[in-house]
């Protein structure tokens, strides 16, 4: 089954209309300024190692390479939520029909730089895995015991519909309670393994 996989990325350029709670508008705009060039570069880095289909879920497809499977998504319903930011859209990928045909999905953040062999990621066979943030180290963990040591800059999953369904029970509440998907997975005790 390792040959039935795809790569995904997410580009959201819509910015929240109402910003409060964090006190720093740049916190939000930082995640909304990735140009199509980021998508194209990530695609080319992946393409050097795999010919698997590559999807970009986006609200702005201008300038994206025509070889990429672009899927337009609408995030307008979230733009007025307190503490919403584009990283939350990663959870929406778990319920996308476009990905159902693939046994395994591999997601990379757009600012990911691939400079090594990704075969171990492609061959990773757990149901849901995130990057384990070894670089944060023990001092970080000791100072932030409530924070996750996992990072969603790379996600490998087979079927995360149960996570999507769980999130949909109270999406606005989770968005207002957590700093993003990493804290959501950690605090809500979503079962995951390390990449």
Can you annotate each of these PLM segments?
Residues 1-80, 99-101:
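N-terminal anchoring/stem segment of glycosyltransferases
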Residues 12-15, 60-63, 75-78, 112-114, ...:
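Short, solvent-exposed loop/turn segments at secondary-structure junctions
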Residues 34-41, 86-89, 176-181:
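Soluble or luminal CAZymes and related metallo-dependent hydrolases
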Residues 50, 90, 108, 150-153, ...:
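Residues that flank catalytic or metal-binding motifs in active/ligand-binding sites
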Residues 70-72, 86-138, 157:
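GT-A fold catalytic core of metal-dependent nucleotide-sugar glycosyltransferases
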Residues 77-89:
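A short, glycine-/small-residue-rich helix N-cap motif at loop->alpha-helix starts
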Residues 80-81, 139-145:
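Short, P/G- and charge-enriched loop/turn segments at secondary-structure junctions
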Residues 152-195:
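Catalytic core and acceptor-binding pocket of nucleotide-sugar-dependent glycosyltransferases
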């Amino acid at each position: 089954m390792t040959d039935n996989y795809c790569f995904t990325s997410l580009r959201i350029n819509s910015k929240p209309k109402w910003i409060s709670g964090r006190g720093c508008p740049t916190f939000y705009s930082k995640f909304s300024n990735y140009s199509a060039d980021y998508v194209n570069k990530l695609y080319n880095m992946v393409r050097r190692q795999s010919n698997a289909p590559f999807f970009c879920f986006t609200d702005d497809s201008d300038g994206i390479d025509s070889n990429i499977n672009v899927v337009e998504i609408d995030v307008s319903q979230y733009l007025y939520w307190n503490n919403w930011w584009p990283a939350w859209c990663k959870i929406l990928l778990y319920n996308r029909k476009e990905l159902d045909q693939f046994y395994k999905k591999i997601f990379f953040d757009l600012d990911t730089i691939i400079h090594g062999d990704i075969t171990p990621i492609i061959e990773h066979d757990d149901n849901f895995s995130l990057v384990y943030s070894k670089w944060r180290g023990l001092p970080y963990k000791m100072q932030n015991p409530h924070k996750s040591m996992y990072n969603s800059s790379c996600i490998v999953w087979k079927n995360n519909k149960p996570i999507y369904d769980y999130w949909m029970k109270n999406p606005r509440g989770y968005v207002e309670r957590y700093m993003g998907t990493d804290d959501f997975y950690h605090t809500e005790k979503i079962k995951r393994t390390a990449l």
